[in-house]
Amino acid sequence: MSYPITDIDGIDGEAAAVLKSVGIRSTERLLEEARTVKGRKMLAMKTGFDEKLLLFWANVADRMRIKGIRKEYAELLQAAGVDTVKDLKYRNPANLAKAMSEANRKHKMVRLLPSEKVVGNWIENAKKLQLKISYK
């Protein structure tokens, strides 16, 4: 699934304008451009954004490929310790739902927590997705 680039936390106003100036308007396009170390280096040179920030945004976009995960849940997963789609594949639904509840209690990120069943569906969907981001 692809969403407007501004659906990623931290990409608004000026950041969105810079990304749009290099042809990145969607989460799908960001993921394509920032999926490799080389791609992130090139994008950093074009935009002036730090490579680590670009990787962070790419990981959010990657999590948003999973059916049912939009901005808020992608960020909540991060707060619960799930940085990547690959991380999500190996999680236990009950433990992750609990970790998400604890993270939400601390940070108040979403109004409605996903059920353990929904979290389990996310995990199953993550297992079916082809990995997009390389880290080496």
Placement of each model-derived feature along the sequence:
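C-terminal extensions
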Residues: 1-136
